[in-house]
Amino acid sequence: MLDNEQLEQIQKKLQKNITSKRYCHTIGVMHTSISMAMRYGADLQQAALAGLLHDCAKCLDDKEMLRQCDKYDIPCNKTEKKQPYLLHAKLGACYAAQKYGVEEDAVCSAIRYHTTGRPGMSLLEAIVFTADYIEPNRDMDCKPYPLERIRRTAFFDLNQATGMILKNTLTYLEE
């Protein structure tokens, strides 16, 4: 069980390791994750921790990302080796456990899948996946579903919101 002081210590440590812009985004994801956890009945502490640490490995350059994956025996496919920035979620889940002391598998899994999602996502995974996309500091032109529509949908139908995000992501990748 995480208390407020422990969460504050993790925040301070994280703030030293990521850019101020990334930290602002991270705090937005943490608060959005907590709000969604309240709405859907998920564990608030797990939502806070997963939201806070979801991008804890994001600020590494490509070479360092690959080196760290090798160090922690994180498997990388061909696409990830060509585009190492895709590894930040896998490495972030590892960092959450190794560097930030996260013991809950559910939290590490939510971090692991916050970018790609996966079939059969747990409630916490779906919350962090969605919170990363809709947090208040995000400002992006989304197709076919506008960001504001996804934000509204996320608080009354989480499954529909995750589907909308996945559709937007596929549309973006196809363009």
Where are these regions (language model features)?
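Non-catalytic terminal extensions that flank enzyme cores
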Residues: 1-5, 157, 165
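N-terminal glycine-rich anion-binding loops that anchor highly charged ligand groups
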Residues: 25
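Charged phosphate-binding loop/patch that engages nucleotide di/tri-phosphates or the phosphate backbone
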Residues: 171-175
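Generic N-terminal amphipathic, Lys/Arg-enriched alpha-helix
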Residues: 2-18
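Divalent metal-dependent catalytic cores for phosphoryl transfer on phosphate-bearing substrates
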Residues: 12-16, 39-163
